[in-house]
Regions:
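Short gly/ser-rich loop at a beta-strand->alpha-helix junction or flexible surface loop bordering the NTP-binding
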Residues: 1-176, 291-310
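Surface segments flanking catalytic/ligand-binding clefts of nucleic-acid enzymes
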Residues: 2, 6-7, 32, 155-310
Length: 310
């Protein structure tokens, strides 16, 4: 049944998915009308495993699949188990099994399987990879943007970076480099996977430095933005405010962006669909904006000028 404004409880499940598969009431309230949240829980569209915490019904599928395959919940499914946000909630749970394990035909399609030898210190008693092992596996096996989302979320949840660096140092040279690349770029300041994925795209721009949740201060104005390169004066915003419960909230957003532009900042705003589904386009827009700014500020080298003119 839809609300008077056309909203339905199904939107709550969509919001939880976009918020990384797990979220707080406060995060969810920013995305959907509060009246829909309880209705979505009652309908079984989302679960509330703890006070003020919401997940999707598929959250426990990993342990069911792990028991069936005599494996261990891992990767994105393990990240969700530890309460971390992920870029994409997996359609099938992730389970790690021994390299020489043979699966019966009836077990195929139950999970996305990974083959790896895990030590006793890699597995929690609940048959889920430990937090550190979970991050390492994600860095090794997932695309950069998905791995960065997990690393950011793990750091945000309090997992010490030094524990991840120590684990990476014990790996072989090739795997060590791969894990360290992501762990060193991780930041606890990123609010959610939406921002993490946007940052992963921006990090591909050579010679840029993007600070998450950057604070911009003037004598008469203050703003905290999702990403900023101070030297270039460019702001990137992950525009996730889907539901304005109050017109005042939308007005504050508009005022903030207008003040930034008036002070010389270039502000780029991207929607969830653009960042998650059209990353090449997002990268192109950022690249053209960076090139323009370098020309304006005389920051281009002779090589960059010739490339820009080509």
């Amino acid at each position: 049944m839809a609300s008077r404004r056309g909203h339905t409880p199904a939107e709550v499940a969509t919001a939880v998915h976009r918020l990384g598969g797990t979220c707080t009431w406060r995060e969810l309230r920013r995305a959907v009308p509060w009246r829909l949240i309880a209705r979505a829980v009652d309908a079984g569209l989302v679960l509330r495993p703890g006070n003020g915490v919401y997940t999707l019904p598929s959250a426990d599928d990993g342990r069911v699949a792990a028991r069936r395959l005599t494996g261990v919940v891992s990767h994105r499914s393990a990240a969700l188990y530890w309460g971390w946000k992920v870029k994409t909630v997996p359609a099938l749970p992730h389970v790690t099994i021994p390299p020489n394990r043979k699966l019966r035909d009836s077990a195929k399609g139950v999970a996305t399987t990974h083959r790896r030898t895990l030590g006793p210190n890699d597995v929690h008693e609940s048959r889920v990879t430990t937090p550190v092992r979970t991050v390492v596996d994600c860095c090794l096996d997932l695309p950069f943007d998905e791995a960065l989302s997990v690393v950011d979320s793990a750091l945000r949840a309090g997992l010490p970076r030094r524990s991840l660096l120590t684990a990476a140092s014990a790996l072989g040279p090739r795997n060590r480099v791969k894990v360290l690349q992501v762990v060193r770029l991780g930041s606890a300041k990123a609010a959610n996977p939406f921002e993490s994925v946007l940052r992963s795209i921006a990090l591909g721009m050579e010679g840029t430095t993007w600070d998450p949740q950057h604070r911009i201060r003037y004598d008469d104005f203050y703003a905290r933005v999702d990403l900023a390169d101070e030297a270039l004066g460019i702001v990137l915003e992950a525009d996730s405010f889907e539901f304005h419960g109050e017109r005042a909230a939308m007005s504050r957003d508009c005022e903030r962006y207008d003040e930034l532009v008036a002070r010389g900042w270039l502000v780029l705003r991207f929607t969830w669909e653009q960042v998650m589904l059209r990353p090449e386009w997002v990268a192109g827009v950022i690249e053209r904006t960076v090139r323009r700014r370098r020309v304006e500020r005389g920051l281009m080298t002779d090589l960059q000028r010739s490339q820009a003119a080509a």
